[in-house]
UniProtKB/Swiss-Prot annotation:
Name the UniProt record assigns to this protein: Histone-lysine N-methyltransferase SETDB2
Protein family according to the UniProt entry: Belongs to the class V-like SAM-binding methyltransferase superfamily.
Sorted UniProt keywords: Cell cycle, Cell division, Chromatin regulator, Chromosome, Developmental protein, Metal-binding, Methyltransferase, Mitosis, Nucleus, S-adenosyl-L-methionine, Transferase, Zinc
Record's compositionally biased regions (Basic and acidic residues): 511-534, 579-592
Record text about domains: In the pre-SET domain, Cys residues bind 3 zinc ions that are arranged in a triangular cluster; some of these Cys residues contribute to the binding of two zinc ions within the cluster.
Database matches in InterPro entries: DNA-bd_dom_sf (IPR016177), Methyl_CpG_DNA-bd (IPR001739), Pre-SET_dom (IPR007728), SET_dom (IPR001214), SET_dom_sf (IPR046341), SETDB1/2-like_MBD (IPR047232), SETDB_methyltransferase (IPR051516)
GO BP field: cell division; chromosome segregation; heart looping; left/right axis specification; methylation; mitotic cell cycle; negative regulation of DNA-templated transcription; negative regulation of gene expression, epigenetic
Top-rank taxon, per record: Eukaryota
Amino acid sequence: MEEKNGDAKTFWMELQDDGKVDLMFEKTQNVLHSLKQKIKDGSATNGDYVQAMNLVNEATLSNTQTLEKGMFITYSNPEVNTHRSNHTPVTQSEQENKSSAVPSASCDNSCPKGCTIPSPGKKVFLPVKNKADNLVKKEAPLHISFHRHICSRTCLMETPLSLKGENPLQLPIRCHFQRRHAKTNSHSSALHVNYKTPCGRNLRNMEEVFHYLLETECNFLFTDNFSFNTYVQLTRNHPKQNEVVSDVDISNGVESVSIPFCNEIDNSKLPRFKYRNTVWPRIYHLNFSNMFSDSCDCSEGCIDIKKCACLQLTAKNAKACPLSSDGECAGYKYKRLQRLIPTGIYECNLLCKCNKQMCQNRVIQHGVRVRLQVFKSEKKGWGVRCLDDIDKGTFVCIYSGRLLRRATPEKTNIGENGREQQHIVKNSFSKKRKLEVVCSDCDAHCDSPKAEDCPPKLSGDLKEPAVEMNHRNISRTQHHSVIRRTKSKTTVFHYSEKNMGFVCSDSAAPEDKNGFKPAQEHVNSEARRAHEDLSSNPAGDSEDTQLTESDVIDITASREDSAPAYRCKHATIVDRKDTKQVLEVPGKKSQEEEPAASQSQQALCDEELPSERTKIPSASLMQLSKESLFLLDASKEGNVGRFLNHSCCPNLWVQNVFVETHDRNFPLVAFFTNRYVKARTELTWDYGYEAGATPAKEILCQCGFNKCRKKLI
């Protein structure tokens, strides 16, 4: 430092001896005056802006004045030096000794338009404009260095006024964290992501992020707000120029994040339905305290399976099921699902004494956090897409609807069924003509107690009436629970002994000698035609109140005589014998395949996912229970999950999660991403239809992948 000070002193002494000190300052003043005029009249270039910013940064102005319009980013190594005064210049020798770091994609689109990124050899400060940055911020110099200290609450900057509606991965940036892509060393060719905290500390993985949030007692940032995936970009959310948002929030504030609706195809609106994000009736106060088999009292975020009883419960059931992979830890990993758990995930419940904010075993109970948009596609009807990049294992939404119970199920003989089928087929064509001219209003609203209290209308021909679930119907006995999808425009009943579905598990195993029946998760191939039928079904249509015309996703618990500790009872199954329905979508032309997806996305589909390696044949499905059939009806009430489309190479997993009860008959059906999903990509899941099961009623698939099964239903 003394040598550097001596060099500076020698420099000015030489100028003084030559009588050029005044000349040097006059030149500096001329430069400042020129920059001032260019900035005022708008003729300044990006280089002029950067030069002026650096000069102001080195001047004697206060930091609040220099940071009033934005933040500063330095592309030098964040670990060099201690806290440096903003007035101290940086010499060339210091810059040469610093290793470069490549800025994260989160900052790429934040610079002014046309701004060029400086070379790593120079230290340049660039203003970063944060989108929707209408907050009152504290001073946040991003060239801060790390002082060895014990992190606490004082390490965090002021909490933003509001974080609702933001990209969840952008929230750390809003809170003055830096997300950087950097090389581990000069010889490395791969980039890695790290975060730099407001106090200068580097976070290199999720474990370090978790411990930092614990140490600082942060209650507004969580582990799922961070992503170390180099493919994830934080600002790739630019909408199309011709996009017109018809509804800013179809949930009407029910969800913590707005879910807009956009139609770029025509002027049709969403069907009228009641938006609900729960399956339980709102007018009843249900007591779930006696429906939990265990609870925890963790104080360190429920991350240690040796201490957390809820994690142990998930692992115990997964280990007892032969469909689970050996050697892998069951459950979430820092609030992200890395693989499917056939036996279900047991989240921490209301009896647990752990911190609800820092608990890593509470995910879906926090609700939708990613930004979604309902839109209309050219061939597949209504669909859902993400507005931001989503990392693998991220929770998207649940499948919600109205919980009903089918009472006194009766079998209909084949002769009567044939006559009923003929009658319904005839009615379907007249109904088609009526539905073609009817357009429902896009009037999604929240549940009302009066609507919940009204029983559904039942047709006189309905052999299996359904009644709504209430607190008197719910018990812990073994039941056969079903999730019902929204109706299609035309529903045809038929009798079929064949079951179908796809297995959401790692492998298949037959019944063992002890009578153990493995858990099986099968998704109804008839359960996902909401996007094609909802646009023409007004809420007040009396024909639509026939509950047996809804698509069904069957979630059942098998009845084994084996010990409870070795049971793997939970399953999601479709039984065509019980549903007795075939969907026929009128008003649709013969479907044509869309162009194949990009090679990178196709490669992900060509490689079999662990959950799709083995399919259990229909003959080995479990015998459905004939008692107390529970239905989850989304035809009139539901959430954004009712609009999710099918794909033979889906980007969503279907996972059963137990939150409000440990009763195996009442899981929540949750959707998680099974890979990285780029912004504005449609979110899909596999309906699991077996091609050839019902050849007369099959519909062509529209997913467009090379390994497409070609048939949707």
